[in-house]
């Protein structure tokens, strides 16, 4: 049996880039909660002792940007300079302007267009992917890397591993078998965890705790064997972390946010963007389409692409590829997809309820992946039943 290795990585919520994603989405939540028609393009950057939010926001809401920044940093665990940032004493800079009137008239006619008339907020192409290798219909390499990162945060916050600090990265290499286009995971080849820690803990204690409290609860035993390689804090020291260790920017972890390197990516980031931005809403609807194709038994693995022009509601193109795993020809699946899903941005926002912010709805998406999550707020993960006739043998 011929196999191959494939690797996906993740970073947890204390990574500086992910901190920025979460702040941008916390701002989006606040805007949509007060004004569902808010137009938001919020970027964040951070470095030692400083966080800056900047971009274009038009909202009727009264937004306290500084409070959102400090609350988000504090909730992640950035409560002192020692851990990489002090939420209560760092500098917070704000440089927000209104959305360009040129864009506003072209996309939503200064809020006068009906939902079906709303144009895409920009050009671009987005991809959705699904695979039957996990119950989430997501790639296993990505699922495990993401769950390891989430577990690192869990054992830090609940006190199981008090030596942990907020910043950390994970990476999982899996040995796969290609079964006529479908991906079948055989075993975990390598697990890599690099996590920020305090001054007192030894490397032996780090390795032992990570195996016992992080890896064992996350990775099913059937995938581990005596040949599995573990790299646990291989650099030997990771005390300085968060924005003190590295600068952070919104939109720098787009593969972690999506499919861990599987499928494809059009390049557009998600966080800090309202649903007229098709980088986000377009990617969400094609994930729902791809997931529904696999869940309905039409294919074992599938990618869907959609593309847009600024100011134009209808997509320019929709593409489906089932990697040879389709039960009927791809062109017939494409027809079903076009009949079942409305790709116009204003209609995506309605069908997926994307104008509803608050309660950390979009903040939740900004760490540990936008897809494959079991949470009612992730409306794009709801499978849409697709009607099709099984071909007669």
From Swiss-Prot:
SUPFAM superfamilies per the UniProt record, alphabetical: S-adenosylmethionine synthetase (SSF55973)
Leader sequence segment: none
Cellular compartment(s): Cytoplasm
ATP-binding is among the record's keywords: yes
GO molecular function: ATP binding; metal ion binding; methionine adenosyltransferase activity
Annotated metabolic or biological route of this protein: Amino-acid biosynthesis; S-adenosyl-L-methionine biosynthesis; S-adenosyl-L-methionine from L-methionine: step 1/1
Family to which this protein belongs: Belongs to the AdoMet synthase family.
PANTHER family recorded: S-ADENOSYLMETHIONINE SYNTHETASE
Protein name stated in the entry: S-adenosylmethionine synthase 3
Source organism: Actinidia chinensis var. chinensis
Encoding gene (name): SAM3
């Amino acid at each position: 049996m011929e196999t191959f290795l494939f690797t996906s990585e993740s970073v947890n919520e204390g990574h500086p880039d992910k901190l920025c994603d979460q702040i941008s989405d916390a701002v989006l939540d606040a805007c949509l909660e007060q004004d569902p028609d808010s137009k938001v393009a919020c970027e964040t950057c951070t470095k030692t002792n400083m966080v800056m939010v900047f971009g274009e926001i038009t909202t009727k809401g009264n937004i306290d940007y500084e409070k959102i920044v400090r609350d988000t940093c504090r909730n992640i665990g950035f409560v002192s300079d020692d851990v990489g940032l002090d939420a209560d004493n760092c500098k917070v800079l704000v440089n927000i302007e209104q959305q360009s009137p040129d864009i506003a008239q072209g996309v939503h006619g200064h809020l006068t267009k009906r939902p079906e008339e709303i144009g895409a907020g920009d050009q671009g192409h987005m991809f959705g992917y699904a695979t039957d290798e996990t119950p989430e219909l997501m790639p296993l390499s990505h699922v495990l890397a993401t769950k390891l990162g989430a577990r690192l945060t869990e054992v830090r916050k609940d006190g199981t591993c008090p030596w942990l600090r907020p910043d950390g990265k994970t990476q999982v290499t899996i040995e796969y078998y290609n079964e006529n286009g479908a991906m079948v995971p055989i075993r975990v080849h390598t697990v890599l965890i690099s996590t920020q820690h305090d001054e007192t803990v030894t490397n032996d204690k780090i390795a032992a705790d990570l195996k016992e409290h992080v890896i064992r609860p996350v990775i099913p035993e059937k995938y581990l064997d005596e040949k599995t390689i573990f790299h646990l804090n291989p650099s030997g020291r990771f005390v300085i972390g968060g924005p003190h260790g590295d600068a952070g920017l919104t939109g720098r972890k787009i593969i972690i946010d999506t499919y861990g390197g599987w499928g494809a990516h059009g390049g557009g980031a998600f966080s800090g963007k309202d649903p007229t931005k098709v980088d986000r809403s377009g990617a969400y609807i094609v994930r729902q389409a791809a997931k529904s194709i696999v869940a309905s038994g039409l294919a074992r693995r599938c990618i869907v692409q959609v593309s847009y022009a600024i100011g134009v509601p209808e997509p320019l193109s929709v593409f489906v590829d089932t990697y040879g795993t389709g039960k009927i020809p791809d062109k017939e699946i494409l027809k079903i997809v076009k009949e079942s899903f409305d790709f116009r941005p204003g209609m995506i926002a309605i069908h997926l309820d994307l104008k509803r912010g608050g309660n950390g709805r979009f903040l939740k998406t900004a760490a540990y992946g936008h897809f494959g999550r079991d949470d009612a707020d992730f409306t794009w993960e709801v499978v849409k039943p697709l009607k099709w006739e099984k071909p007669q043998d």
